[in-house]
Amino acid sequence: MRFRVKLILLGCVAGLNASPAVAQPDCPHGALDTRYCDRDGDMVADAPTDAKQFIDPDTLIFSYTPIEDPAVYASVWENFITRLEILTGKKVKFFQVQSNAAQFEALRSGRLHVTSTNTGGVPVAVNCTGFVPFAMMSSPDTPYASHTEIIVTNQSEIRAVQDLRGRTIAFTSPTSNSGYKTPIYLLEKDFGLKVDVDYKSTFSGKHDNSILGVVNGDYEAAAVADVVLAPMAARKVFDPAQIRSIYRSGSFPTTGYGYAHNLAPALVAKIRQAFLTYQIAADANLSPEFPAQTKFIPISYKQDWQVVRQVDAATGVKYDCK
């Protein structure tokens, strides 16, 4: 059960200015690409030691992880963006990123400054792009957690996980934790079902594509994140009575929010302040999308993403940062 995720950088994203990092040969890298140093052992890229390598752009580029049509989230994040502009004193532009590949490319080349990345994409972004995750959403009592669900249509003959043998399961993308890596790992570990041996696989590109593909009868079954499934149902994108969940995994950390490692320290401090003092529950745009979440809390990639890295290791994931 091994596969390789290759990050290939294809060129520029229109309207964004690049400022790529250069190789850092004389420092500890850990699992990071050689462009980045990890002297303190926290598993994320250190800030540059040369002040000339810091960037302090007049306009900050912000994006949200591409789990659905990015246009949906432009208005969702509008109030937060205003808050970010006030605290940083900079104009903030929402970048409608279409894919993880485009997001990682923009991060690595310096054209994206503040963003969120889906659970499974965080290790890719950390190791290959210099992404520094520092926050995630939380309810008053517990951090926002993600689960993998395997869904089928309500009329499907598939009633239990073992019924997936010989069927085709739609996954989202190879970098997705809840949409690919975790389900293929757990299906083999707990049920003896090996991907592309005991069942066939296909990729939809995004969680919303997988969900709507099941609803519309295009896919027999799909592995998706509940943190995408529930908001889509709440927005009445589909009727939840049309589907059934036949499996739900244990919890994983969810979307990680962070910044490019080479942003100026004073700017980083203001970005962190904007997130960690923001009241999600008071935001009329953001709170309906994340109704149980009230705030952002600090995270540690080294500690909080350990379980995700363990799944990657167990499934033989290797990342080629090119």
Cite the ranges covered by each PLM segment.
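A ligand-binding cleft/hinge motif common to bilobed small-molecule-binding domains
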Residues: 119-130, 183, 188-189, 213-216, ...
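Short helices/loops that flank or line small-molecule/ion binding pockets
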Residues: 101-115, 128-129, 162, 207-227
